[in-house]
Amino acid sequence: EIGAIANEYGVPYLLDACQSIGQMSVDVADIGCDFLSATGRKFLRGPRGTGFLYVKQDWIERLEPPLIDQFAANLLDEKTYLLRRDARKFENWERYFAGQAAFGRAIEYAMDFGLPKIQQRIFKMADKLREGLQEIPQLEVTDQGRLKCGIVTFRHETLDAATIKSELARRKINVSVSSGSGSRLSFMERGIESVVRASIHYYNSEEELEHFLSKIRQLVA
């Protein structure tokens, strides 16, 4: 819907897909975006410091990178340079070669496993986790939206998110705390200070899910 509106009025549309790439199928043609960026370190399980940028062909021709080195363009004479004609004109000569190779392997791994299978598994497990959390007294699952993914967020009426995180860490369970820096208006509107964030992936088992829920029950009892 956003892509259709943006395209109708000629508004450039950049989509941050960091949380989507690697856990579900993403099609830039269906989305209608002009640009799409994503990181390698999240659901793709690639190295930190890696990522990629998609640029629609007509925008490649219209834009010039803010910084140009000998990779993005060829210097023809002392006053003239010739930019590359593909999206690699936005890259730099110096690069993280080891990370780039590992990132490529992470992408191959996900593609070999199959993104539809990955999405089905992640969404199924995340739904189970939400159901289990909703059964715990004084605990609220805070996820919204028509399509709920593998990122599960919740809060407790009396225990703050930071305390829950530290107590779970003592029990060798890793979660994170979201304080709303990326969704400040939504948090303010809903009266939320912070939430606990538990991310599910396809390699998580039902036994691990139940172990997590049992520790939450013990913690808030």
Regions inferred by a protein language model and the residue ranges of each:
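Pyridoxal 5′-phosphate
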Residues: 1-221
